[in-house]
Amino acid sequence: MTAQENPMRTTSTLARVLAAAALAGAACTGGTTSGDDTGDDDGTTVDEWDQKLAEREYDYNAALRIASLRLTGRLPTLAEVKAIADAGDVAAQKVVYESFLRSYLDTPEFANQMVRFWRDTFKMGESAMLDTAPVFAAQLTVENRSLTELFTATTGTCPTFNATTGEFTAADCANGVTTHAGVLTNPGVQAHFFSNMAFRRVRFVQEAFACTAFPAEIADASVDMGGAQAYTSPWPFQSIAGADNGGTVDFHDTSAVVCANCHSTMNHLAPLFANFDDQGQLQTTIQVKTPNDGAPDAQMSDWLPAGEATAWRLGVPAADLPGLGQAMAADPKVAECTVARFWNWALGKGDIVDTLSLVPTATIESQTAAFAQTGYTLQDAIIAVYTSDDFVKF
């Protein structure tokens, strides 16, 4: 894990949660205020936690301490601490802080921290094959390249890393793929997440890059299927396979849960990964099994009925993995997910999916917008997070 500490800090996310609780309490008591609220001259209520947020002050030495640990794995030097302390007013301290921040990004230590960050994000690494995907992501970050290359790069997607020098050596993945698509065709990813019907590979893509568990798509209105739950996906119910349209696994079952709520998305993605074997090598036939008795090989009809095409999302077709990569690169939710992961890492939070450490869109709105304006350059996204008020004010 990346070297981190967890200082107690108040964020805008916390404010929103507590404000919502306060509003709920007011509704239950007829709108009366408690001792936690004070009134303005015009009679409006001011929330205590909004006041506390407004009382935060810039502390660039405290921010530097955390940033140095995150970005280099070490504490700042005494000279760095004194440089900020002696800089003068807050504006001058900000300039010194940001200069140190940028200098950290040019060190071998930062490269090592990025390898650790992406290993944790991908939940894989520390062997020659399993390291290639996180090392490629780390290389893109250290070299301030675009996030889009993570899904669209056709060469150099299996680099190696020298932990001593912090240097990356480009190398192509050799797993039988004609046209690579970043980490989506990486042999380590395919081997590590091998499973029945390729669903673990699909889960990896969804959770690592969209920052949510399945179900991934929710319709504006649900549909009563006569079962225990409603159908909430925007996809037509019959757009995936089931016992009634040729599938050997009944994804149309509604007796306990509505399987199609998740599988309406999953089944449109899984066939794209189905021809990779358990070593991550691309073969000419489907290599994954079904969970049925005897573990027979899966067939296309087990995921989708005849005539149904693969896709990233409803209305976003993806005929192959390069097509999927292009679709993901163009998805603003994927970009927002990356900023959210950098945000949680900087502020010492847990994994956004595993621990439900969610980051509201409004909280990182300015950082996400800046990310798009730079062409999704990864190092610039990190700087935007580490210079935000929520990071440097205490």
For the regions a language model picked out, list residue spans one by one.
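Extended surface/linker regions that mediate inter-domain or inter-protein docking
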Residues: 95-269, 329, 333, 351, ...
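Bacterial N-terminal signal peptides
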Residues: 17-26
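Residue-level detector of buried hydrophobic side-chain packing
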Residues: 28, 67-68, 73, 118, ...
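Active-site-surrounding "flap" and adjacent substrate/cofactor-binding loops of secreted or lumenal enzymes
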Residues: 74-104
